[in-house]
Amino acid sequence: MGLLPTGTGNLLARNLAMVIGDLSKAARIALCGENRAIDVGWALIDDRDEEQAFLVMAGVGFDAAIMAGAPHELKSRLGPLAYFVSGFRALLEPRAGVTLAVDGRIEPCRLVRTIVVGNCGRLLGGLVLLPDARVDDGLLDVVSLGPKSIRGWLVVAARVITRRRHGHRIVQHWQGRTILINSESPQQAQLDGDAIGEVCAMRMRVDRGALLIRVPTAGGSDAAH
């Protein structure tokens, strides 16, 4: 598969060190670049029959509520400010009781704002939410964020900026091949930034090396710097 990343928010392209916004370079990579096998995440929502694929991140809770609360019409009027408006609304919602299972190992029920499961770890602005995530390691990386106050959000921000993974109950990390999230109440969910509505359960697995994608050649001039 070749990528033509024209938008600033193309997180897969950014995680693969692709050039953003230059269609001629992107087309050259798509035609002449190196093949790289990357993992594909699959999510089964509640009792639905079909899995849905994701390549970057899936989320339940606050991050998905931001996506759901910023529809196209609002983004057309406000631009990026739409996400701040949506995020403020989502902050008013209570934390959710969630049970998490990683490779069948059940973690205690916890109150969280959001749980993000990622195949990649890098966000916009160079922030890294999942420091250990690798797009081809056959693992899904998980982070739960459970702040209940402004002070808690400052802890989250500090942990993300410094990429610290251990030592605080508000920000916790795991890795595994299968992830199960069960929420006590319906929560907004998203796959690769697309809101998919409210869910109570999401089961995810990784399909290692399932997708061949064209990337810049090693040492070539088409890589992002």
Roles of regions detected by a PLM:
Residues 74-82, 117, 123-125, 131-152:
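Gly/Ser/Thr-rich active-site loops/lids in small-molecule metabolic enzymes
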Residues 102-109, 134, 140, 144-225:
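ATP/nucleoside-binding phosphotransfer catalytic cores, i.e., glycine-rich phosphate-binding loops
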